[in-house]
């Protein structure tokens, strides 16, 4: 299945999951899996949240930032991949001067 992120209406999600500023997302959701291209501008973040019935894979396309994962902190840059398994918590933070652009997949686990 082809997914055209450029042809999608971008969703602007302010203070997403309790984060700072606006999370911009081009998102495909078939009810079982969310597949998205996301953008966090400088100083923006996705707030700390727990994946109860799903997991998340984040691949950084461009920019730099960090993930708070459970009790640790991880630096991310273009080419980095972060995995948050079911039952774990994380947040994504753009602490750089440029946009943080990423690809993410969130499959529901049954």
Predicted regions and their residues:
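Conserved short histidine dyad/triad with adjacent acidic residue
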Residues: 36-51
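Short acidic-glycine-tyrosine-enriched beta hairpin
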Residues: 72-86
